[in-house]
């Protein structure tokens, strides 16, 4: 139930399969700390100890495999529990989808101590997820009709090349009343965006911003004003993140 609530509140997360739950119960190498409030589990952290040196057995690191929390107070409590393990491990490896996670730390610099020109300190290693792929754009929009968008009325056409079918396609989406839907094929588009199929998936999932894609030349639009409005409609406050193996 705790993980289900976490998945429902965080963009991109999915429910655990029964196989994952059974595997977790049998994995004796992973330790878990739970946060309970009124008898209800409101968060937990799953971690394992790993050797951090080939020549010094006293050097260890703590690798966090799961960090589930219902709010910031629970998160801070779980991080405090990890801090109590500092006599057993000198460093901690955390995986998170929160871009601003380093603001929780008094010193945001990671253990690399890398300095990046000019005046930048390395805080983390970033990675691109490969879980979310767009195979059928129209079906994706239909199945996610429940999503809430900012207020606005606009019809957008996305032109891209379907790499699997080896043909050009056009996905028309109508935004109205805080929802989106597949627009009729002959509807007039307020703005037409041309991009790659993979970038379209990122745009529709909220993994990237349309304005950045236009600045970089990764996408083009035929109406600058409407493109800015479309960027506002597509923007979501949290980028998708998934901590499940697949």
Describe the predicted segments one by one:
Residues 1-246:
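Intrinsically disordered, low-complexity, positively biased terminal segments
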């Amino acid at each position: 139930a705790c993980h289900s609530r976490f998945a429902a509140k965080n963009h991109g997360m999915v429910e655990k399969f029964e196989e994952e739950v059974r595997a977790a119960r049998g994995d004796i190498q992973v330790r878990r700390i739970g946060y309970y409030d009124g008898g209800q589990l409101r968060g937990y952290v799953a971690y394992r100890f790993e050797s951090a040196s080939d020549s010094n057995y006293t050097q260890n690191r703590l690798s966090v495999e799961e960090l589930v929390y219902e709010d910031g107070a629970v998160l801070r409590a779980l991080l405090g529990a990890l801090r109590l393990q500092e006599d057993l491990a000198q460093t901690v490896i955390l995986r998170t989808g929160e871009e601003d996670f380093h603001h929780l730390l008094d010193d945001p610099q990671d253990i690399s101590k890398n300095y990046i020109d000019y005046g930048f300190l390395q805080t983390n290693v970033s990675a691109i997820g490969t879980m979310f792929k767009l195979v059928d754009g129209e079906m994706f929009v239909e199945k996610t009709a429940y999503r809430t968008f900012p207020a606005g009325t606009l019809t957008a056409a996305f032109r891209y090349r379907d790499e699997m079918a080896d043909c050009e396609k056009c996905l028309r989406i109508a935004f109205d009343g805080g929802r989106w839907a597949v627009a009729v094929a002959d509807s007039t588009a307020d703005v037409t965006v041309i991009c790659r199929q993979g970038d379209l998936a990122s745009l529709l999932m909220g993994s990237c911003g349309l304005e950045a894609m236009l600045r970089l030349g990764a996408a083009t639009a035929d109406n600058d004003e409407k493109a800015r409005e479309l960027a506002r409609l597509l923007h979501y406050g949290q980028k998708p993140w998934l901590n499940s193996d697949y």
